[in-house]
């Protein structure tokens, strides 16, 4: 070869199928990577459906306007892939969340997988955040407040031991602020004022313990939104990159603000980030 190394040959040998009832070893460092490789060809071909995979957590989202055929065919495709690759879907743990903002929506059709009906729930915890059917994020805020208050207790204990303010601040950033800001791009802009006040109360308590104000959650959210928007613009493989290109003015090169008919969309990530970048905070 050109590098001076002798050519190498490689051959793979596959054993026959072996059945075991001991289960797979848990806690292996390579397990998430190996499972990701194993499921790499599990893709969703439907145009109006989106499949999100994170290790062994898989979600399938369908955008339904008039017909559910595309969404249901995507579900059938996923079930078929699992059957072909010796993966068993646990239907009892599979949940469906229906997001419908109509005033009087008709009852949704049940989703059937291998003869079992998938339970429809009002909220579901996925990748650490609770998603509800109205996208109000109140249940998620409640969970955040509970976890943050548990950590504030330890801050109070450290303060009673006269720990230095610097260490208290480090403890806050590592254990409390990380909880308050986790996935904040998805939910913070859409929170009601009541929920924002509950989160703000935690930062005020932490500020008193530390001795100086901590970073306001609104400031943290805005800085994070602007940074993420720039990352998306530079990443041509990102699903939202084309959406931003369509919003870019051909004359000035600035991003054109999204037209929002509802406060729900106006306060979501993309419209908010574009307003911040353009310097038109509202």
Model-derived features: positions:
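Hydrophobic packing residues in well-ordered alpha-helices of helical domains and bundles
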Residues: 51, 68-71, 75, 89, ...
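Conserved polymerase palm-domain catalytic core
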Residues: 1-54
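Charged/polar positions within long, soluble alpha-helices
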Residues: 83, 87, 153, 157, ...
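Mobile genetic element proteins and their domesticated derivatives, centered on retroelements
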Residues: 27, 39-42, 51, 56-58, ...
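Short linear motifs embedded in intrinsically disordered, charge-biased segments
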Residues: 192-282
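Catalytic palm subdomain of template-directed nucleic-acid polymerases
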Residues: 23, 58-83, 101
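Basic, alpha-helical interaction scaffolds
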Residues: 115-186
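Short, conserved micro-motifs composed of acidic
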Residues: 67, 88-122
């Amino acid at each position: 070869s050109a590098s001076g190394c002798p050519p190498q040959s490689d051959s793979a040998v596959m054993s026959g199928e072996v059945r075991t009832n001991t289960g797979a070893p848990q806690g292996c460092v390579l397990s998430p990577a190996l499972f990701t490789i194993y499921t790499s060809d599990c893709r969703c071909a439907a145009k109006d459906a989106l499949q999100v995979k994170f290790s062994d957590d898989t979600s399938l989202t369908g955008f339904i306007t008039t017909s559910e055929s595309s969404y249901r065919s995507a579900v059938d495709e996923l079930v078929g892939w699992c059957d072909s690759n010796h993966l068993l879907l646990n239907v009892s743990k599979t949940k469906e969340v229906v997001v419908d903002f109509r005033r009087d929506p008709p009852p949704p059709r049940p989703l059937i997988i291998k003869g079992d009906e998938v339970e429809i729930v009002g909220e579901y915890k996925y990748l650490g955040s609770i998603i509800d059917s109205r996208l109000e994020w109140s249940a998620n805020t409640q969970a955040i407040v509970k976890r943050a208050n548990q950590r504030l207790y330890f801050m109070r204990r450290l303060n009673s031991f006269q720990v230095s303010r610097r260490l208290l601040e480090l403890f806050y950033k590592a254990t409390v602020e990380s909880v308050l800001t986790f996935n904040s791009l998805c939910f913070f802009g859409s929170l009601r004022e009541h929920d924002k006040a509950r989160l703000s109360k935690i930062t005020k308590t932490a500020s008193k313990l530390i001795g100086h104000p901590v970073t306001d959650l609104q400031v943290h959210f805005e800085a994070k939104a602007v940074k993420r928007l720039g990352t998306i613009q530079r990443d041509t493989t990102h699903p939202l990159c084309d959406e931003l290109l369509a919003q870019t003015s051909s004359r000035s090169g600035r991003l054109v603000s999204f037209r929002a008919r509802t406060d729900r969309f106006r306060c979501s990530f993309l419209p908010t980030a574009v307003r911040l970048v353009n310097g038109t905070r509202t």
